[in-house]
């Protein structure tokens, strides 16, 4: 048994010396530059990048409440009176100038009048939940 142990220790010592010699050789090769060879140089590669310009268009949409009913408009030819059918009711609208106007009977909604030539067109717009149309500021404001 002693002979096996001595044999293993001898192999371990011999292996340690070989590794140690390799480490010294490796270190010598990398740390001591050879005068006959050029020093290693580092080259940085410059990659050119090109970018394509993208044109983005923002589209703003407003979501109408799900409970909103179909609105139709009819134009009358005999007067400036426009008729709005909404929620089973009929409203007569007279536009005097372009822009938003309030119809008292239409809860939380307003109408935008626009003119093209001699014809008036109207668009019914809802205010957001919790707001109402203020005829003075001509905007939807908090419903207090």
UniProtKB/Swiss-Prot annotation:
Alphabetized GO MF terms: chitin binding
Alphabetized InterPro entries for the sequence: Chitin-bd_dom, Chitin-bd_dom_sf
A Pfam family that the UniProt record links to this protein: CBM_14
Residues in the signal sequence: 1-20
Domain of life of the native organism: Eukaryota
Keyword Cell division in record: no
Disulfide bridges in this chain: 127-140
Ranges where the record places region Disordered: 24-77
Keywords, sorted A to Z: Allergen, Chitin-binding, Disulfide bond, Signal
GO cellular component terms, A-Z: extracellular region
Domain Chitin-binding type-2 per the UniProt entry, residue ranges: 92-144
Protein name (record): Major allergen Blo t 12
């Amino acid at each position: 048994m002693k002979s096996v142990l001595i044999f293993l220790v001898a192999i371990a010592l011999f292996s340690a010396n070989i590794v140690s010699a390799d480490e010294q050789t490796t270190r010598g090769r990398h740390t001591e530059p050879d005068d006959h060879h050029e020093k290693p140089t580092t080259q940085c590669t410059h990659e050119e990048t090109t970018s394509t310009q993208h044109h983005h268009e923002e589209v703003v949409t407003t979501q109408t409440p799900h409970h909103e009913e179909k609105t139709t408009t009819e134009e009358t030819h005999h007067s400036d009176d426009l008729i709005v059918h909404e929620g089973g009711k009929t409203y007569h609208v007279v536009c005097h100038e372009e822009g938003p106007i309030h119809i008292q009977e239409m809860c939380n909604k307003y109408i935008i009048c626009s003119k093209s030539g001699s014809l008036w067109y109207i668009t019914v717009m809802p205010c957001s939940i919790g707001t109402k149309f203020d005829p003075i500021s001509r905007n939807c404001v908090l419903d207090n």
